[in-house]
Every structure is written in C-alpha cells, then in structure tokens.
Curated annotation (Swiss-Prot):
Homododecamer. Belongs to the phage portal family. One of its GO terms (biological process) is symbiont genome ejection through host cell envelope, long flexible tail mechanism. This is Probable portal protein. One of its GO terms (cellular component) is viral capsid. The gene is 34. It comes from the Viruses. Forms the portal vertex of the capsid. This portal plays critical roles in head assembly, genome packaging, neck/tail attachment, and genome ejection. The portal protein multimerizes as a single ring-shaped homododecamer arranged around a central channel. Binds to the terminase subunits to form the packaging machine. Residues 391-457 are annotated as: Disordered. Keywords: Capsid protein, DNA-binding, Hydrolase, Protease, Viral capsid assembly, Viral genome ejection through host cell envelope, Viral genome packaging, Viral long flexible tail ejection system, Viral penetration into host cytoplasm, Viral release from host cell, Virion, Virus entry into host cell. One of its GO terms (molecular function) is DNA binding. The keyword Cell wall biogenesis/degradation does not apply.
Length: 457
C-alpha cells in the first residue's frame, strides 16, 4: 500500500472539489468480467490465461514489439513536420534508481490493454511539468462519469488493499492525474472490452485440454498394456509379479526383449481411443483460435499452417503484421500520450509517433532495390540511405544532395538548357583548274576560217 499511498497521498484531485456525489454516474465494474467460469469449468483470469502457451506467445509478441519501437516527438506547422526533443517523461518515465524505463512502461501498458482491455497510468507532476509515469493495476481503478457544466467527464476511483486484505478507497482523480488508454469499446461505453473476458470460452477450452493432457500422462494415468492372469492373487503376489515384469521388460537395456508368460497369463496392449486422442486436435486448433483473438499471425507464434496467407515474402508479412496487428494499438497509445503532451505544453501542433521503419524492413535485396529507386528519383539522399542502414554520413556533406536523372537536374535547381547543336560544317567548293589563255596574234591553222584563207590568198 506504500506505493499507492505515496502516489495518491493527496486523497483526491482538487479539480473535483464541490461536485456533488449524486452527479457521479458509476460504470459497472463487471464489464471487466475477470475471473468468470467458462463452460469447460475452468476459471479464466489474466494469470490463468497466460498459462496457455498461445496466449502467452501472443501477448509477448505484441507487448515486446511495441515496447521496443522507437518513439519520437514532432512539431507540425505550415504543412511541414520537424522532429523535436522528446520529453523526458517519455524517454525516462521513471528515472529514479531502480525505476522502470520506457520499454518496461510500454510493455506493461500493452499487457494491460491485451489482458484487461484498459491501461491506466499515474501522471506525476512537478509544477507545470510532467516528471514521470507509473502503470497502475486496472483492477484497482473504477471509471465513472461526472456531469460538469452539462458535459460528461471521466473520473477515476482508486482503490488499494491493506494488510488485512480489505479494499481501501484512496480517492477520486481526473484525467490530468490518471491517463486512461482504452482498448476496443462498445458503442456508448467509455471503457475497453477485455479480450480475456470475451474470449473466455476459447481460452477456457485450451486450459481444459491442457489440464486433461497433463492428467492423462501423469504417472501413467492410462496403462500402456495389461497382463491378465487366471484366478485371484493376493496384494503381495500382485506386487511381486508387477515388480518382476518391470525388472524384466523395462529400461533401454531390455528394449525389444521377448517376454515369457506362464500359468495362463495373457498380455493385452491398450490403445488410445479416438475420443481420448481428440484433445490433441483440440489443442492444435486452439493455437490459431487464440491468435485470431489477439490479431497476430499464427506463424509468428510457431504455427506455420497457412502462413502464406499473410504474404509470400518477409517484407509483405511484416507489413501485414504492422497494419493489422500493431497499428490499432499504436494509434491508441499515441493518442493517450498526445493528450498528456497537450496538457503539459498547450501546443496542439506537437505529437508523438512510433517509428515503424525497422519492422517494415525487407530482405537486403529488397532494401537495396528500394534505395536505388529512391536515390535515382530524388526521394532519398545518400546520407538518408546510409542512416537507414545504420551507417555514418559521407564526409564534407557529400551525401546531403538529392539527385535525379541528368535530363532533369538536381532537386531544387532549374535544369540547365541543353546546348544548341553545332551547325554542320560547310565544305569549301572544289577548285576548278585554271584555263590556259589564248595566244595573241595569228590563230592556229585548225582554227582558221574561210575568210582568213581568202585574205591570205
């Protein structure tokens, strides 16, 4: 009780002073319906459900995957998003020596959602600043609605258990003091549905089959064979005969040894009936049945049946797991943290977001093809690709530029016009040979005319 008393030592939130008791609209705590008895006769509580390997594997997969995702804070203004410093209460929710870190807080938050449908976190304030978060036991928080100025508001009734096992009221608190992250809610409700409660028949059947199998095989609950002898035997005679048979036919050294039966004894092997063997198929069927409850791919909890229905490649299966299994829970947690961020800063442009890049990474060949296309089309810079592959940037800013094909130029710059083609070379005309000048004076005889002949005569 010391932890709760220190956490809620003030008894109630001052914001609730002056509100009349009749204004409370209590919500029936039986919505949690934890510890109900299934038709199989098994009592199903979160602790009992975790004894089923499929339940444990499903909640472990979701809680540990979400808890290890990077969580960043951003500021979005003017259509652009810029990463800013993450508040300490998100990076170090409980920084005291021996306190829990972010992974522990997130893991417990997701476990509360998966097992009980609701997560409650105590918010520790120091003046106007949040200084830490603590995950609360959902079974010790009752949610109510109160009418304030005609509006319905959530308030939380916190309980603890004293040394005598009695329930002790610690006080009433507002959403400023207790962050409530609900799971899937029915229309008109304001608390989440418990998956364990609504699936108690499936989980109860798995528990019953598991218990039946344990009892079936415990200490040879059904004998593998029977030796019949005529007449009657005393208890001492039966014990001697049983011990003699065990000594002669049990153990590795006596394997496949021929057994000799005397005095009319008969050996009969006892086979498992179909009804008795049915629990094996029942247990096998419960694995995908429980995986379906939590929305996880069965192949991720070691049931490879129909694994290709979630995608044919690693990248496709990871994307499907991210979209259909993780994203709904991540959105709820992000919304809760965003409410706290606004309560602390009054800045509605700030928000937190999980980074899913790591889980959506494909095989090396697929990643290299993606980076190659991104680099060629100016989507990524070389340094961004290197950072995604956990490599250091290129020196001297060589990897900061975005590049596109040469016919487009660099991103952010006007492409240089292509140079005009050079005019074709003009060949000089071929030189004609010079004509010989005609000699002056008397022409040749061959070229003489008749008139010239007459003159000569």
């Amino acid at each position: 009780m010391g932890f709760w008393s220190a956490l809620f030592g003030r008894g109630h939130s001052p914001a609730l002073d002056g509100i009349e008791a009749r204004a409370w609209e209590p919500y029936d705590p039986s919505i949690y319906n934890l510890g109900a008895v299934a038709a199989s006769g098994e009592t199903v509580t979160p602790h009992d459900a975790l004894q089923v390997s499929a339940v444990f594997a499903s909640v472990r997969l979701l809680s540990e995957t979400i808890a290890t995702l990077p969580l960043s804070t951003y500021s979005k203004r003017g259509g652009s998003r810029k990463e800013i410093v993450t508040p300490e209460w998100l990076d170090y929710p409980n920084a005291e020596p021996g306190g829990m870190g972010r992974i522990d807080i997130l893991s417990q938050t997701v476990l509360s959602l998966l097992l009980q449908g609701n997560a409650f976190l105590a918010v520790r304030w120091q003046g106007p600043n949040i200084v830490g978060l603590d995950v609360l036991d959902p079974t010790k928080i009752h949610v109510h609605m109160v009418m304030v100025d005609g509006l319905r508001r959530k308030v939380f009734e916190a309980y603890d258990i004293d040394a005598d096992g009695n329930e002790v009221l610690l006080g009433w608190f507002t959403p400023r003091d207790v962050l409530h992250i609900p799971g899937m809610m029915l229309p008109g409700d304001f608390v989440g549905c418990s998956p364990i409660s609504y699936a108690r028949e499936s989980i109860g059947l798995a528990l019953a089959a598991q218990k039946y199998g344990s009892k079936f095989f415990a200490n040879g609950a059904m004998p593998g064979a029977v030796v019949e002898v005529p007449g009657t035997m005393s208890e001492e005679g039966l014990a001697r005969a049983r011990e003699a048979w065990r000594a002669a036919n049990s153990g590795v050294d006596n394997a496949h040894r021929v057994a000799l039966l005397t005095e009319g004894a008969k050996f009969s092997k006892v086979a498992m009936s179909p009804d008795e063997a049915q629990f094996l198929q029942t247990r096998q069927f419960q694995v995908p049945e429980i995986a379906r409850i939590f929305g996880v791919p069965p192949h991720l909890i070691s049931d490879a049946t129909n694994s290709t229905s979630w995608g044919s490649g690693l990248a496709e299966q990871n994307i499907a797991f991210t979209m259909f299994s993780l994203r709904p829970w991540l959105e709820r947690i992000e919304a809760g943290f965003n409410r706290l961020l606004f309560a602390e800063t009054a800045d509605r442009f700030r928000f937190v977001k999980f980074n899913l890049d790591e889980i959506k990474r494909g095989a090396p060949k697929e990643r290299m093809e993606l980076w190659s296309l991104g680099l060629q089309n100016g989507i990524y810079s070389i340094d961004e690709v290197r950072a995604a592959e956990d490599m250091t940037p290129l020196p001297d800013g060589l990897g900061e530029k975005y590049r596109v094909p040469l016919n487009l130029g660099e991103v952010g710059e006007e492409p240089e016009p292509e140079p005009a083609p050079a005019p074709p070379a003009i060949e000089p005309p071929a030189e004609e040979p010079d004509e010989e000048p005609e000699p002056e004076g008397k022409p040749d005889d061959e070229g003489a005319t008749e008139e010239d002949d007459e003159d000569d005569a």
